[in-house]
Amino acid sequence: MSLLITSLAWGALLDPEVSSASKVALLDAVLEASTLLLRQNGSVRKFLALVAVLCLAEKTGSDNLPALILGSISTAASLSLHLETALRKSCVSNDQAVQTKRAMWILYCIDKSYALRWQTFSLVGDGSLPTTNPPDTALPSEVATTLSLEWLRIRSQYSKICSNILQLGVGAEGEPSENRSNRAVVLSAALEEWYGSVEISQMMLSLEHSDAVHMKLQTSYHYYEARFQLLSISLPDPRSSSPTGSQECREVLRRSIREVITGSNTITSEYLLQDCNHLFIQTLALSMLALDILLESDQGCGKENRALLSIVAGFFARVDIILPQSSIFEEVSNLIEILTYR
């Protein structure tokens, strides 16, 4: 039942003809079903259903996401799904075994992204996975396409970078700054290589224009979120003097902020409703911009920063029209006024 409700909610989310009230009602139904699902005894069917709900929760920014991650991990651990033999024993068919392996990788990816975003401990390690890489075989019994399998492989590569960034952040305090900087440079290069990879380019070329734009936005917000985290680790305490290296980091940070904010005009209202991560990365960029303006106390809000703040105001004005019940536009407007006229 939970899979059926989740499928209906996904369909409603992707269909612009469905009313907002219907979408909210279906998402509420998914939340209620997931609460009941978490109370059930552990089984492969429960695990697959939890991961399906987890994917939807990540897109919609559900407050239930941490509970779903923990519930999925607990279910997988109780069935020893990280072990090939135990996984196959728990599954009723080869097709279900492949789906379960794939679901383990999806859980891994979502866990890493969540941990990176909120700077918490990741709960799914590489040793928790039954295979070295995600299964890349589409099954006759499912609708999954080659592109969706390719995207899982691409995201799994990104998640491994996230894992390394998390490890760098955890060890940052007691580690010599030079060692930390060197590791950050290596990870930054790996992130750039991932973002400009042939696999992503080929996938874009195989998509229709609207789908390619959507996929480009999706890879972009993953890329910039990891980039912001890396730069935050690399930058010294704002109260300390800024050596040449940190000044270079600040320039990269400003360029990243500019790229994210100026790219907001390519995010359609439809995309905003389908994926709340677009809203998060714009909010993160605004926060970074605000901090940069406040740290440059002697220069005030320059011409370029005022232009960026105007773009931000336009973006969140659109959000206010799409989500009239939200107070975010008023809050952003107050912040922009403070930054502009302080």
UniProtKB/Swiss-Prot annotation:
Keywords: Signal, Virulence. It comes from the Eukaryota. Pathway: Mycotoxin biosynthesis. Residues 1-20 form the signal peptide. Induction: Expression is up-regulated more than 10 fold in toxin producing cultures. Part of the gene clusters that mediate the biosynthesis of AM-toxins, host-selective toxins (HSTs) causing Alternaria blotch on apple, a worldwide distributed disease. AM-toxins are cyclic depsipeptides containing the 3 residues 2-hydroxy-isovaleric acid (2-HIV), dehydroalanine, L-alanine which are common for all 3 AM-toxins I to III. The fourth precursor is L-alpha-amino-methoxyphenyl-valeric acid (L-Amv) for AM-toxin I, L-alpha-amino-phenyl-valeric acid (L-Apv) for AM-toxin II, and L-alpha-amino-hydroxyphenyl-valeric acid (L-Ahv) for AM-toxin III. Gene clusters encoding host-selective toxins (HSTs) are localized on conditionally dispensable chromosomes (CDCs), also called supernumerary chromosomes, where they are present in multiple copies. The CDCs are not essential for saprophytic growth but controls host-selective pathogenicity. This is AM-toxin biosynthesis protein 12. It comes from Alternaria alternata (Alternaria rot fungus). The gene is AMT12.
